[in-house]
């Protein structure tokens, strides 16, 4: 089983599909990586040679931000927005939608379950 960036790739899938199991690599980036390294697109992960795995590993390590580093970078960006006190940071802090969606009726995913405020008389 090929292990790249701390992730075990599924053995029976094609290489490009297997690479998408790594956080930060989607379909288009996976195709790009396979093309850069010269690995055949039809190759299954279990059929990769050690040399091909090393080429994939080095390409991903050198050219892309993936897994823990990417998660850390994203959380640091959000933390920075919250610290400087900009509008987006305030929305993150309050747990409300950040990108301008209306919150009068929906936004339940971001706001959480309903909390009844008080009965009107």
Swiss-Prot record:
Ranges for the region named Disordered are 94-121
Can you name a GO cellular component term? small ribosomal subunit
- Cysteines engaged in disulfide bonds, as pairs: none
Q: Does the keyword Zinc apply?
A: no
Bias kind Basic residues: ranges? 107-121
Q: Does the keyword Ribosomal protein apply?
A: yes
* BP term (GO), one: translation
**One MF term in the entry's GO annotations:** rRNA binding
Enumerate the Pfam families for this protein: Ribosomal_S13
Which UniProt key words apply to this protein? Answer: Ribonucleoprotein, Ribosomal protein, RNA-binding, rRNA-binding, tRNA-binding
Function per UniProt: Located at the top of the head of the 30S subunit, it contacts several helices of the 16S rRNA. In the 70S ribosome it contacts the 23S rRNA (bridge B1a) and protein L5 of the 50S subunit (bridge B1b), connecting the 2 subunits; these bridges are implicated in subunit movement. Contacts the tRNAs in the A and P-sites.
Q: How does it assemble?
A: Part of the 30S ribosomal subunit. Forms a loose heterodimer with protein S19. Forms two bridges to the 50S subunit in the 70S ribosome.
- Family that this chain belongs to: Belongs to the universal ribosomal protein uS13 family.
Q: Which HAMAP family match?
A: Ribosomal_uS13 (MF_01315)
Name of this protein: Small ribosomal subunit protein uS13
Protein encoded by which gene: rpsM
């Amino acid at each position: 089983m090929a292990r790249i960036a701390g992730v075990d790739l599924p053995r029976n899938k094609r290489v490009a599909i297997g690479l998408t199991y790594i956080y930060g690599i989607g379909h288009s980036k996976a195709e790009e990586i396979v093309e850069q390294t010269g690995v055949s697109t039809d190759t299954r992960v279990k059929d990769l040679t050690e040399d091909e795995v090393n080429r994939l590993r080095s390409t991903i390590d050198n050219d892309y931000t993936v897994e823990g580093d990417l998660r850390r970078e994203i959380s640091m960006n959000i933390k920075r927005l919250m610290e400087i006190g900009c509008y987006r940071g305030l929305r993150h802090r309050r747990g409300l939608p950040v990108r301008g969606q209306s919150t009068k009726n929906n936004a339940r995913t971001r706001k959480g379950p309903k909390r009844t405020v008080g009965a009107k008389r």
